Amino acid sequence: TGQEAEKNAFGEGRLHIVENDLSAPELLTEKIQGSCDAFCHFGWGGSGSGARTGEQLQEENLRASLDTVRAAKALGCRRFLFSGSQAEYGMHQTRMTEETECAPRSAYGEAKLRMRRQGEALCKELGIRYIHLRIFSAYGPGDHPWTLVESCLDAFTGNAALSLGACTQKWNFIYITDLAKAVRALLETPEAAFEGLGNPVFNVAGDDTRPLKEFVEEIHRLCKGGGNCLYGDRKENAEGAVNLIPDIGKICRITGWKPETAFGEGIKKTLESR
């Protein structure tokens, strides 16, 4: 499991944990000795649906992220990878490529999109390669308890009822291990592969897109049919009933990465980790 791999890496001296406040990345230069090759920035406050409309919090996230770029430069990093979001795209009914127009419907999506523009400009100024991931619904062991997958697992294994929206929109999930491998692929791909690309964005998603209700029903079956779903009993989240129809051709072509874990397999692994 991921936790076992982390424990082994830590024990073998390959993983060093440095704690630092998300809002003060400049302190990292005092805590990390020597230079670094790359910086992966996944820290972002208020990513849950309830906090996505808070403009002040999202503005603070953006400021801290830009300061993190400066800290990465001070640490000697040549590549900066930022975790953007599907929320940047907004409402679409067709396949989303990295060139699809963005019209975010929440302060969260707007701030992530501003980081894509301002982060790229700052990295160019500092001489760092900027890579912007647009991640589509990652799931797996250790996920936040309020996510759809975790809420389904809690309800169905506990033989409880779960209030949901209509779940008629198209959706896409990516298992956490596949996401980690995508990040690794983008970090290890030679610099020449990125030269000439006018857009630093890479969609990172699974290869299985279908109505959200079908994913929920699959989780229900894998939980042996316990509990039940109350469709249409809950209002939609901050972005509304958004369709997720990602195109992952770019990252597959540039890095050779591809998703490996079928949704059902990922759910089984998540159940086993509980």
Range-by-range predicted roles:
Residues 14-15, 19-60:
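NAD(P)H-binding glycine-rich loop region in Rossmannoid oxidoreductase-like domains
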Residues 37, 48, 55, 59-67, ...:
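Conserved internal alpha-helix in NAD(P)-dependent oxidoreductase domains
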Residues 38-41, 66-107:
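Conserved Rossmann-fold NAD(P)-dependent oxidoreductase catalytic core, especially the SDR/UDP-sugar
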Residues 43, 81-85, 105, 134-136, ...:
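Active-site beta-alpha turn of Rossmann-fold NAD(P)-dependent dehydrogenases/reductases
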Residues 49-56, 91-96, 144:
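Conserved catalytic-core motifs of eukaryotic protein kinase domains, centered on the activation segment
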Residues 94, 117-171, 176-187, 218-220:
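NAD(P)-dependent short-chain dehydrogenase/reductase
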Residues 107, 111-114:
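Active-site helix of classical SDR
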Residues 159-274:
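C-terminal substrate-binding subdomain of Rossmann-fold SDR/epimerase-dehydratase oxidoreductases
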